[in-house]
Amino acid sequence: MKKHLLTSFSKSLFALLLIGSNVSAQQKDTTSRPIHLNQIGFYPAAVKKAIVVSDKGGDFFIQTTQKKTVYTGKLNTSLRPNFAGHIVQYADFSAFGKPGKYVLYVPSVGYSYPFEVKASVHKAVADAAIKAYYFMRSGTALPEKYAGKWHRVEGHPDTVVLIHPSAESEGRKAGSIIASPRGWYDAGDYNKYIVNSGITTSTLLSLYEDFPAYMKTVKLKIPESNNKVPDVLDEVLWNLRWMLTMQDPADGGVYHKLTNAAFDKFEMPDKDKSPRYMVQKGTAATLDFAAVMAQASRIFKQYPKELPGLADSCITAAKKAWGWAVKNPEVAYRQEEINKKFEPKITTGAYGDNNFTDEFIWAASELVATTRDVAYLKNINLLPDNRMPVPTWSQVRLLGYYTLIKSDITENVVQDLPEIKKRLISTADDMISGVDSN
């Protein structure tokens, strides 16, 4: 099954790379915009295809950068035009696998952007994708030694965060101050959101959990690179330690976000001096938190000397969050309603959700996988409908399925497991079919 999922991911990545391939083609040379391919390159034994948006040409040629032809093939016309309505042909040169730097040439059309064929061809891209999280760190300077031309000074230390009236509790009155440092900034603003962090942090934890041997070799050139913890986990820790500060220690509930009242201006982090607020607890945030902490606990348990007590802290926090969610199963974050009742009004990203079935499935699955206590699945309907939705911040059900399947939990314990496996494989097959038929 894992092979199905990895194949699906690889083909989806290929499709995404094709979509963006003409961005770099805007060079004053002989490259042709109608020829779209993976500009980074291909593994020697992998599928290799290029899309030619033209009805011209019959043959295509793989040439060295010195224009020496090393492979020849026939263009195949697509069974249907692309979304723009143009005639689309594709060049399949999967049979060619000699390492080197090449271009694809189609007479009457032109040359492709240069690409490579080599082992580990996507390593630099993969490393850069993970290193991107370092640049999103809040509450720390990014020295030039690690950040290069994107170096900057510290912004948003978040040592003085106000409890918003929507988040008031008996032990934390509105206006009281707490500290909530670290974490990652969100997509285009300087706020920090638990719901977004949930799926993001879990994705990186799963990357390590699924490929531990490889991830231990990945060096990201971050300040923690010389310690004995894999760099990807060091980066996770920057956000995970912030997430732990988002839980109310009194009752286990988790605040939805740490935010300014409104979005920032387009300015560097250190220039923003706006008050920061901890906003309402919610069921979605609390369950996402529980899931991540349970997953983190079983992973960081492998590093007791380097991170003493962290695994225990994570599972304790996860259990406490679960307890709050069970008592408060339908607390939705509705920003418009909050703004009718409280000041200041909060107008940053809402990331609201009104259905928590998927969050309960995910959190319960992670807790079962970590604690081996199947009681967490009691009263949880693992298959509430026939859908197998692709994970996103607002739909995390499949993350729970994937965890259950990867664990050594048997169908004797979880009776729905065979059906979950069947549906997951079918979904992966559909994804592959969609790529192949487009």
What are these regions (language model features)?
Residues 20, 83-90:
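Charged interaction patches that mediate protein-protein contacts
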Residues 29-34, 59-86, 97-113, 122-438:
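Glycan-recognition and catalytic cores of secretory/periplasmic carbohydrate-active enzymes
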Residues 91-97:
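Short, hydrophobic beta-strand segments
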Residues 117-119:
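Interdomain boundary/hinge segments at the C-termini of tandem beta-sandwich modules
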Residues 49-51, 90, 103:
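Beta-strand secondary-structure signal
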Residues 1-28:
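Bacterial Sec-dependent N-terminal signal peptides
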